């Protein structure tokens, strides 16, 4: 079922789309899905050129698809837009309002939707740069560990991002709590992209907490392949 036909019927019959058909069965435009996936997996690293490319993707979505998307997809787009605004140091007033609107609902949940995880990731990001206080940081950090669905690759990818967001903010003494879960995820998915991140945080734990030079050196042996993101996460983090 095409989205345009459903919207037409909804208007003629004066019924919400969700009352006509199961929202999950709506045919989402392939081009939109392509743009969405790129936005979710893209990183700007503060580079203006990368930010510009992502902004062009958002422009295309808002011009061609947004008004015809299901509500859940519209929310997803809005959260991704806010995330880019935060990364690029733009006006985040709307973003903080959006976060406030949905965040307290999320705190009451025991299971998280994909959009919930996006908003949680946004919250941790805002905490990291001082846009949000950390009132719920510890509570949410622990709850996230209880929710890991290894069968859903898209959510697992988001959980990896969330774990990184937690690790760059928790006390060094707590690193292994989160790297243990991170290891389980990488082993279950066979996706070792973030393995250098795990080794980096563990090496810092062994050096600063256990003061075990042998363990530190052994762990650091795995770091020659560390990527720029991993290096920034570890060495730009304030020593505590």
Name these PLM-found stretches:
Residues 37-240:
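Extended amphipathic alpha-helical coiled-coil/heptad-repeat regions
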Residues 1-9, 109, 240:
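Short intrinsically disordered, low-complexity coil segments enriched in acidic
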Residues 21-34:
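TPR-adjacent "capping" and linker segments in tetratricopeptide-repeat scaffold/adaptor proteins
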